[in-house]
């Protein structure tokens, strides 16, 4: 049985290579890849804001694969949690690519271009391999794209009434529009949270993200209509 079956609810847990070994050939995977030197520099700068001098323990091999070689002495609990999340993605069965820009173009199963903009995701987005298979995109890894210029976005935050009886109007508004401050290390942690919590309730993405936001001195992010205990 595939130990990552929960990430692919639309597939049989006994279905290796997503039942398509021609397109999805990497069963063991397990890397975060950042190809361009410019993007690697942006990533290093983000890690320095999260881990201070420990950011020097990150390195890339000739293929752009991210490694962490060093201890965690002196890191806070939140820093250790974020590093643990990064390591889990690096050691997972799936490959994850990270790049920086405004948009990315991928192919569908018929070879047609599909353009996805970071503005559609509030400054960053993640295409999970599970979603790519379901939508028949021709990709073989999780894809993270970060807009390095994004500084804020708006989300539809949920209130306590969101979890109550929707027919009871006395509970008040279920959602409200709120501004969310962003920066590059914050967005990286958020998107890594999506990879970590694929197939799980998406409040866990915010919980992970808020550990990084605390390190960065950003306000705690609220759950919203796309990230809450009812959303998978």
Task: Show which residues each predicted segment covers.
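Short turn/helix-capping motifs enriched in Asx and small/polar residues
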Residues: 1-52
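Catalytic glutamate of the conserved HExxH
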Residues: 20, 184-187, 191-195, 199
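Predominantly extracellular/secreted Zn2+-dependent metalloproteases
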Residues: 30-185, 198-232
């Amino acid at each position: 049985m595939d130990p990552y079956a929960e990430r692919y609810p639309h597939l049989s847990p006994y279905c290796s290579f997503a039942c398509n070994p021609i397109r999805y050939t990497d069963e063991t995977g397990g890397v975060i890849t950042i190809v361009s030197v410019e993007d690697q520099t942006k990533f290093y700068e983000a890690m320095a804001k999260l881990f201070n001098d420990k950011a020097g323990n990150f390195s890339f091999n000739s293929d752009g694969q991210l490694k962490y070689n060093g201890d965690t002495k002196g890191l806070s609990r939140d820093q250790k949690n974020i590093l643990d999340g990064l390591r889990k993605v690096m050691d997972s069965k799936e490959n994850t690519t990270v790049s920086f820009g405004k948009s990315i173009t991928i192919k569908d199963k018929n070879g047609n271009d599909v353009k996805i903009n970071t503005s559609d995701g509030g400054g960053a987005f993640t295409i999970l391999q599970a979603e790519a298979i379901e939508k028949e995109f021709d990709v073989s890894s999780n894809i993270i794209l970060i807009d390095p210029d994004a500084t804020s976005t708006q989300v539809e935050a949920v209130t306590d009434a969101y979890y109550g009886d929707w027919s009871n109007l006395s509970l008040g508004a279920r959602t409200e529009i709120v501004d969310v401050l962003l920066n590059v290390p914050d967005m990286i942690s958020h998107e890594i949270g999506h990879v970590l919590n694929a197939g799980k309730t998406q409040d866990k993405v915010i919980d992970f993200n808020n550990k990084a936001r605390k390190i960065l001195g950003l306000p705690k992010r609220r759950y919203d209509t796309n990230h809450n205990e009812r959303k998978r």
